[in-house]
Amino acid sequence: MGKYPNDGRIRVQLVAVVANIAAPTVAELNAGTHITGFLSKDGLTTPADQNNVDVGTLAETFNAQVPGTFGGAVEMTGLKDDVADTLWNLITYDLGRYVVVRRGPPTATAYAAAQPVEVYPARFHEPVPDQTGGDEVSRFTISAPVYSQPNLKAIVAA
């Protein structure tokens, strides 16, 4: 697959049970809740904290560093809905779920074996309504701290 836009090519699923985060099964993923349609276009941020460790010495003029810790939270911007409000009602304080992100295939494409996905073990904060503004839809912010190392190169199993 060549280069592709994000629009219409990301799928976000909240999954209750994943036995192996390196190889979530099609059945596990399909048992989850597909939330992509409840997120704003800019509404998904995956953990990007990358810390470095200084290893330079006083004898050197170069500030040497090596990789250190990494992590963070999955941050999402949800869209309020005056009918079902599915995502708002789903997210509760301390809810544990796997946030599964698939990039590339069209959003509506069913999960299939051999697809690459990212799997983030997360616990959610209470969703918080965003500040109001004119000519905007009603939004809310979701923070889901990732509590153990995610698998960014998982492959869907049959």
Predicted regions and their residues:
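Polar, enzyme-active/binding microenvironments
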Residues: 17-26, 30, 106-116, 156
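Viral virion structural and adsorption modules
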Residues: 1-3, 149-158
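Solvent-exposed edge beta-strands and adjacent loop segments
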Residues: 1-77, 121-138
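Structured, beta-strand-rich domain cores
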Residues: 60-108
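Short beta-strand and beta-hairpin "edge-sheet" elements
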Residues: 103-154
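Short intrinsically disordered coil segments
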Residues: 90-95, 139-141, 156-158
